[in-house]
Amino acid sequence: GIIKKSEVEVLYPRINVVHRMWDNLLKLEAQISGYQRSYGFPYSDWYENPYYNALKYNPTYSVKNEDGTWNESGSSPTRLNPVALLEETKGDNKDTNIKMYGKATLNPIEGLNINWLFSREIDNFYGSYYETSRHKSTTMYGKNGYASQTSSRTQNDMMEITAQYANHFGSHNIDGLVGYSWNDYNYRYSSMSNYDFPSDDYTFNNMGVGTALTEGKATVGTSQNSSRLVGWFARLNYNYANKYFLSASIRYEGSSKFGANHKWGTFPAVSAGWNMAKENFMKDASFINNLKLRAGYGITGTIPASSYMSLTRLNLGGYAYYKGQWINQLKASGNANPDLRWEKKKEFNLGLDYGFFNDRIFGSIDYYIRTTKDLIWDYKVAVPPYVSSSITANAGSIRNSGVEVSLNAVPVQTKDFTWNSNLNFSTNKSKLLSLSNDKYVAGNYIDGLVFNSITHRLEVGKPLGDFYGWKSVGIDENGGWLIESADGTVKSFADAQASDRKVIGNALPK
């Protein structure tokens, strides 16, 4: 690396095996690949990054004092001597990843392919970090050496079975597919830290000797996350003479992340197309090689990031006096919701694909309307009857509509040289349709915070991405800010009220 102790060693093994049998009726494939990466980045947090501190630290300061100790005269909790950071830290990190992939393809009759696919990816990470007794953050907080270790294991399994058939009868062309998919995800994490070590020689290899452990100040943490997704799907495509096109598909999927009453969702789609360039009435326009009008409608589902939003979540919070001592309470941090279900996006699309002069000029024009319903949001609820003041539920809806245009050209194309030009244009209009329903109420707007200050507002009937704050209109004779109040008059910022805030712009491009 370009910074001391930032060297990285990486090993990339890969094995591929392909075998055919039964006169090529069956094809077997297997692949094993992965990597092992070892590195020792000498910092744990951004403010201990030596490169970050080298940019902020005064370059005229000497690295060390006359007595050989590190010069920390210009240091602060967020500005440290970068050379001292490098020399007084030690890191040892190993990340091992392996991917296993297997596939079997059977062709029992012409046009029919039966596929079985399985993959497993495993990632194991182990990281160790140590700050010596001379490290600024340990001397600043009296820790006399600090060590931490983290480890994690991620395993992602996937299986898919499909049967696909394709054939043609004269000018009629069909292909269809049916299948089943399964995905299982598991993640485990553990960490520990300790400080006040009798010697720096231990580094992170004898975590138990730090006296912070006996004082109850060491930290230990573990977490686990798992989810499963299962789906059945089918698709049918038909075209006549590559002129008229029809397509229909459906997916029936279930996810463990949703409530017990709504784990499954059905997602159909249908589309049609007409390539007018193939019609007889277009023969005189020989420069047009493609002019395809198409339309489609479909529903897709969105899965939340967290695996346990439909369940009661527990957390430590508050203390209770019990049998002569204060006990940290275990309490609900979120209510169970057996009716938590898929977010559903319904989209209609109307488009035109074009190509002129054998696709020397080509592109597309699309118009879409997209409505997302059953948005997942955290709502405030009464306690009792609920055990927690928050519940994750489906209530809101958003509509987006817009136009997308692409224009591509090949002005010059020779044996040895090709010139491609591309131009894209898009516009989108969004509108928040609702935030609440009969059961869960969030009001007509939600304010977004950055560092505890209101910066955005999400309001029913308005577009997404609105900046919300005070509108500055100048400064007074003393250099103070002037703002526009709610009634349109000008007032000093010192007299500003929360009600004077207004929409002052939008973060999203039109």
Stretches with model-predicted labels:
Residues 230-240:
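Structured alpha-helical segments in the cores of large, soluble enzyme domains
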Residues 1, 246-255, 411:
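Transmembrane beta-strand segments that form the barrel wall of outer-membrane beta-barrel proteins
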